[in-house]
Amino acid sequence: MKCLAPWVTIRQDEDGSVMPCSSYFTRLKDVKIGSTHKNIQEFFNGSDYNDFRMRMCNDEDIKGCIECKVDAENGNPSHRDYWNAKYANITEPAIRELELCLSNKCNFQCIACNSHFSNKWYKDDKALNELGVDKTGQLSPRRHLTSPDDMVGVNLDSLVLLRILGGEPLIEPRFLNIFEVLKERNIIQNVELFINTNNSIFPNKEWQEYLRLFKKITIVLSIDSIGKLGEWNRHGFDMKKFTINEGRWINFPT
């Protein structure tokens, strides 16, 4: 099941681990940016990712790609369709889309989440694990996970889309370091920015100044339900605040 994702994109997770894309079912084994690899460019150009591309070319069955496989079997659109349609004419690997989760820092404790994506869950996940509840893949190794934000040596000349996630990305100031790199390299105006946020806060002035520099921004307001049910689903959720911030995004000048 060939997919062009490994030729055009990479995702760096909260703990420095990497995946070809957000649909990939698991993390690539024994890969950590800042530990086994200096930066994402070193991994992107390295033998491990080249081997992964060859497996794609050979149409091997890759366990982590099960989501797109199931979508295809059921006649549904998939991320693979997105990559293959958008980048059908590419010839050489280059980082054209980048997905970054720099930490698990979050101000919500949602019932569908875990400590890997929200440090608010760490104490509970740890306690449940100690009581014998299997939290494999959910309990983070420590309360605060951080992923490197150093873009030195990373070739971003072909970048057209940057996705930032969390945790809650709008409370992670290190994303501003990424924006500054794009500005200094004079490419920020060529890049579309995608933000997935719980919409509990609105960006401050410093954030706004950077946001206006991007070619386009897409804001995904993450919500499970509204009103009292929303507050039950997501500890920290405030319907009134959500509505106010939604209006501010609608009127945000770009």
Predicted regions and their residues:
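Accessory C-terminal segments flanking Radical SAM cores
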Residues: 1-84
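C-type cytochrome heme c attachment motif
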Residues: 66-67, 108-112
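Detector for the c-type heme attachment site
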Residues: 70-71, 113-119
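Short cysteine/histidine-rich zinc-coordinating motifs and their immediately flanking basic loops
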Residues: 75-90, 118, 122-126
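Core AdoMet radical
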Residues: 95-105, 116-146, 157-173, 185-203, ...
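Leucine-rich repeat
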Residues: 146-151, 176-180, 205-207
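Generic structural signal for well-ordered alpha-helices
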Residues: 179, 207-211, 243-250
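Short, acidic, metal-binding catalytic loop of nucleotide-sugar glycosyltransferases
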Residues: 181-186, 252
